[in-house]
Amino acid sequence: MAKSSREKIKLISSSGSKHYYTTTKNKKAPSKKIELKKYDPKIRKHVLYKEAKIK
């Protein structure tokens, strides 16, 4: 099987609710850490999510 060109990452909520989303990111493209505004169902608001590595 071929090696994937995408890296799995975790987007962690900045609200402190410990909620996270998982997604993939292109390994080869030079980029900064991802920061997205997404919905946090635990606090029922849109908050900033920051990229973190999956352990």
UniProtKB/Swiss-Prot annotation:
HAMAP family: Ribosomal_bL33 (MF_00294). It comes from Buchnera aphidicola subsp. Baizongia pistaciae (strain Bp). InterPro entries: Ribosomal_bL33, Ribosomal_bL33_CS, Ribosomal_bL33_sf, Ribosomal_zn-bd. This is Large ribosomal subunit protein bL33. PROSITE patterns: RIBOSOMAL_L33. Belongs to the bacterial ribosomal protein bL33 family. One of its GO terms (cellular component) is cytosolic large ribosomal subunit. SUPFAM superfamilies: Zn-binding ribosomal proteins. Keywords: Ribonucleoprotein, Ribosomal protein. GO terms for biological process: translation. The lineage of its organism: Bacteria, Pseudomonadati, Pseudomonadota, Gammaproteobacteria, Enterobacterales. One of its GO terms (molecular function) is structural constituent of ribosome.
